[in-house]
């Protein structure tokens, strides 16, 4: 297939930051490197990397393009879905524009149907995720989906994926996971070494980086420097320690984190897809690689999996390791699985760990900032 290498017609109207994003990814494409876009942590990036492609997260956390998306999609739909579609439709996301393939997944009904419309203007491959993660039938299905994805990439880009290439990709991706985990585990320090806002900025921003070796090096150096400064006494004041769980956040949804920290708390950890859920577990580098990929990705504790034992397990681990004083469940409007699962999370946090829990529902607008501030301030004061 021919790769996309030219800038969109509306390039000149973009802000300088976004122009730089387009130019950076265009430089990559001029080297004839395929770009695979993704929205979800279930996408097995190692397979695309082994095919010689660069994998990048796509824009989906701003209300900038939601109005355009609502011309095609229902208004009462999850903002992440509308934002994803809107950025693709309007050519305002450099990473989507230059993607040669977008990989979706069946994590929710809204996404599944949205991908059908997205496929009208971009090649889209949807991976069929099982509803369970704890039985052999589900494992067999997901393994076959990973193999099917491999075969599609080989056909799409004309580059056979060898076992050696896949193993090397797994090793590299694991190194990235460990570097990210070492960085975000700085939140375990008490009192904190840095704010949750800064942690999120780095972890979320890492999903848009192309050069993994450079990213790993920068993360390791940043972690080393922060630990050294902490040992010398550079640290934040003691405040109530908050653990975030729930829907993916970043971009506009990071308003919740900022409000928590503006009203007397510190966000010390992220259990959600933006944080530990994606990186806490690595892929086994030995044995059958497709079995190893299957096991790693089915261990992601997403609310689309039922029953969702992995989320409870990771949440308990993080409550203890991060010495959390409270848990805040961030739910995007119209995200039914996370909204329904909030009762189970509330029971788990309160009964198992004996600490306060609160769920907040939000979207990508700023309209609810006042209401959120009031609720979050009251919760933190209670701690």
Model-derived segments and spans:
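Glycine/threonine-rich flexible loop motifs
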Residues: 113, 335-341
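An N-terminal, globular interaction/scaffold subdomain
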Residues: 35-89, 100, 107, 114
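A charged, amphipathic alpha-helical module
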Residues: 2-34, 147, 151-267, 271-279
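Proline-aspartate-enriched helix->loop->beta-strand connector
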Residues: 319, 323-328
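Peripheral docking tails and interdomain loops at the edges
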Residues: 3, 343-383
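Glycine-rich, highly charged phosphate/nucleotide-binding loops
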Residues: 75-92, 303-317
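Redox- and metal-dependent alpha/beta enzyme cores, enriched for Fe-S-associated oxidoreductases
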Residues: 30, 41, 47-61, 68-69, ...
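Acidic/His-rich segments in extracytoplasmic proteins that coordinate ligands and/or metal ions
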Residues: 85-155
């Amino acid at each position: 297939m021919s790769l996309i290498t030219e800038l969109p017609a509306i390039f000149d109207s973009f802000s300088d930051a976004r122009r730089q994003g387009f130019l950076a990814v265009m430089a990559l494409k001029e080297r004839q490197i395929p770009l695979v876009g993704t929205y979800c942590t279930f996408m097995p990036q190692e397979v695309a990397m082994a095919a010689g492609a660069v994998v990048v997260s796509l824009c989906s956390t701003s209300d900038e393009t939601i109005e355009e998306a609502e011309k095609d999609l229902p208004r009462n739909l999850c903002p992440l879905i509308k934002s994803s579609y809107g950025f693709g439709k309007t050519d305002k996301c450099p990473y989507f524009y230059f993607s040669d393939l977008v990989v979706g997944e069946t994590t929710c009904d809204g996404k599944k149907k949205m991908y059908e419309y997205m496929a009208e203007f971009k090649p889209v491959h949807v991976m069929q995720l099982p509803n369970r993660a704890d039985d052999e039938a589900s494992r067999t299905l997901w393994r076959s989906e990973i193999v099917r994805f491999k075969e599609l990439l080989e056909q799409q880009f004309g580059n056979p994926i060898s076992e050696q290439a896949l193993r090397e990709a797994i090793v590299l991706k694991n190194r990235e996971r460990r570097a990210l985990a070492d960085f975000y585990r700085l939140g375990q320090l008490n009192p904190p070494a840095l704010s949750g806002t800064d942690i999120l900025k780095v972890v979320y921003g890492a999903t848009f980086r192309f050069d993994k070796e450079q990213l790993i090096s920068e993360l390791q150096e940043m972690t080393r420097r922060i630990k050294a400064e902490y040992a010398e006494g550079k640290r934040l004041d003691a405040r109530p320690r908050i653990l975030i769980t729930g829907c993916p956040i970043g971009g506009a949804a990071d308003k919740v984190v900022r409000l928590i920290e503006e009203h007397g708390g510190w966000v010390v950890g992220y259990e959600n897809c933006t944080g530990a859920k994606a990186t806490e577990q690595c892929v086994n580098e030995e044995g059958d690689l497709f079995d190893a990929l299957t096991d790693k990705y089915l261990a992601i504790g997403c609310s689309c999996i039922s029953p969702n034992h992995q989320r409870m397990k990771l949440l308990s681990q993080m409550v203890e390791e991060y010495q959390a004083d409270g848990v805040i469940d961030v739910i995007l409007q119209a995200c039914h699985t996370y909204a329904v699962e909030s009762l189970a999370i509330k029971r788990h946090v309160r009964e198992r760990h004996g600490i306060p829990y609160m769920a907040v529902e939000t979207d990508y607008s700023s309209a609810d900032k006042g209401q959120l501030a009031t609720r979050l301030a009251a919760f933190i004061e209670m701690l």
